[in-house]
Structure formats: C-alpha cells, structure tokens
C-alpha cells in the first residue's frame, strides 16, 4: 500500500515538474500526505494501545512455537521408540491430547513401524478425528458426511 502511494506521489511530482495539471496535482499531493499520515498514526495507536494481559501472543518470539513443537515431537518419538511393537489406543489418545494431533501425525510420518502397528495407529487417528468432529457444537453427524 505504501509502495503504491509512493508511486502515485512520484507520478504527481513528475506531472508538477512538467507543468501538467499543476493546480489539481498540488491539491492531490496534499491529500495523499494527510491520508498517509492519518493511516500511520492510526496504526501507531493500535500498536501502543494493546492491553498486555489480553494480548500475550504479541510478546512471543517467532521461533518460540517452532522449539515448542520440536520438543513435543521429541517426546512423542521417544515414546514410540520405547513402545514400537505395543502401541495402545489409550496412550496414543493421551499423546494427542498432550502434544497435539499435528505433532503426532508429523512424528508418525517420520518413524518407521511394522505394518500392523502402523495400520492400528492410523485407525486410532481416524477415530480421534471423528470424535473431534462430532464433539464440536456447531457440527452435526450429517454435516461431516
């Protein structure tokens, strides 16, 4: 947006220097300046008027979620390495609840399992996703079909 404003200001300045539309261009240039400054001040007000208690996410570092997800995946990998042949449905659901479905699916795509265990884990994930869809208040079983 600022780039388009800058281009239009440069175009107006070129027109003023050449003598084309001098009266109208000066008025447009003044309007552009006031509009830009109004936009910038409103953005500054929004940034400075944030309530610190309600908006904690503003102070999160961009890489914080990356390291958190990485830690969760490491925990899941250690569990799956220890229980490679003997994976139960309840424990997989606990892992999903504790570490998130996205992290469990990511680890499952990286870790190699025997085929029977892999099929049972996929069934658990499908059942878990189905339970999630039915427990959402705005969805009915007819909506998910």
Curated annotation (Swiss-Prot):
It is found in: Secreted; Host cell membrane. Keywords: Host cell membrane, Host membrane, Membrane, Secreted, Signal. A motif (RxLR-dEER) lies at residues 44-58. Disulfide bonds: none annotated. The keyword Protein biosynthesis does not apply. It comes from the Eukaryota. One of its GO terms (cellular component) is membrane. Residues 1-22 form the signal peptide. Belongs to the RxLR effector family. The RxLR-dEER motif acts to carry the protein into the host cell cytoplasm through binding to cell surface phosphatidylinositol-3-phosphate. Secreted effector that triggers a robust hypersensitive response (HR) in Lactuca sativa cv. Design that is resistant to multiple B.lactucae races, including Bl:24. This is RxLR effector protein BLR40. It comes from Bremia lactucae.
